């Protein structure tokens, strides 16, 4: 049986009366007190105990009410009612401190729950977007494959065009799966060893796979080193992915025949390097420039399939940058172009 605070106080005070009376009776037997004095002390004890009980009730009732209110508050929170409760208990000190600790805990849990809900919503949108993106290349592959199989596509130039489309859509699927893999591994805590990087050699290895595409689309791509940059230590694998995604984005949102510029500079104290990739594309309005690195955001107002991809490239690049001692900034003008700048901090492997 669990007793309330009020019951425990009443039992304690009432129990003190017979205990005190017994002690006084023993004192009378031992002739420490005479009969009149013993009776007086006994009555005084009873009256004092009653007054003590009354005074305790006066002080304890508000405390019990606060504890009941606090209990209701905790039950509501336990039942999933995470709405903020601004009720404050200013006294006694222990209840005040307990309430403050509970409010702090409730606030942190509420923030975590809101974050979980937000992440779940983002994941749902991400899955829906990826499912949408997968349907288009798959439908195209199925359609052209059936056309080739059934003999509907017979002319040589149509057959060649069909194969080109099949390869393009297969590459698009590969990119989608690659993005999905990177999304899964982004928050696993995977680390990369620092490597000595010669920037010109790194750029050659990154740009080489784009050579045929740039030539086929009649584009101009120029790389400009503003000053001589010595080899430095950085995380090669994330850096390659960041630059690849930014270059993909520049090609995706600029027209065939346009220009891509890559400008590399080192700051005066030689501890950071800026790699700026500029295009002559559609541009991004100022109010959207802060959102382009969100996981579920795409620059297109509608999900325009002509750009391809999953729309995750910038999100992946930004996450990798934040995790690996780098930063991405953006400047853009509508119908003029966009510049994405990666700021790398050289790693000091001796520290």
UniProtKB/Swiss-Prot annotation:
Residues covered by the HAMP domain: 61-114
Keyword Ubl conjugation in annotation: no
Entry superkingdom: Bacteria
Gene Ontology BP terms: cellular response to phosphate starvation
Keywords, in A-Z order: ATP-binding, Cell membrane, Kinase, Membrane, Nucleotide-binding, Phosphoprotein, Transferase, Transmembrane, Transmembrane helix, Two-component regulatory system, Virulence
InterPro entries: 2-comp_sensor_kinase, HAMP_dom, HATPase_C_sf, His_kinase_dom, HisK_dim/P_dom, HisK_dim/P_sf, Sig_transdc_His_kin-like_C
One annotated GO molecular function: ATP binding
Main enzyme class: transferase
Transmembrane segments: 9-29, 40-60
Subcellular locations according to the entry: Cell membrane
Catalytic activity: ATP + protein L-histidine = ADP + protein N-phospho-L-histidine
Main location: membrane
Keyword Kinase carried by entry: yes
EC number: 2.7.13.3
Any GO CC annotation of this UniProt entry: plasma membrane
Modified residues annotated as Phosphohistidine in this record: 132
The record's account of how the chain is modified after translation: Autophosphorylated.
Membrane topology per record: Multi-pass membrane protein
All residue ranges annotated as the Histidine kinase domain in the record: 129-348
Function: Member of the two-component regulatory system SaeR/SaeS involved in the regulation of staphylococcal virulence factors in a strain-dependent fashion. Probably functions as a membrane-associated protein kinase that upon sensing the appropriate signal, autophosphorylates and in turn activates the cytosolic response regulator SaeR. SaeR/SaeS activates the expression of exoproteins involved in adhesion and invasion of host cells, including hemolysins (hla, hlb, hlgC), coa, DNase, spa and cell wall-associated proteins (emp, eap, fnbA, fnbB, efb).
Protein name: Histidine protein kinase SaeS
Classification of source organism: Bacteria, Bacillati, Bacillota, Bacilli, Bacillales
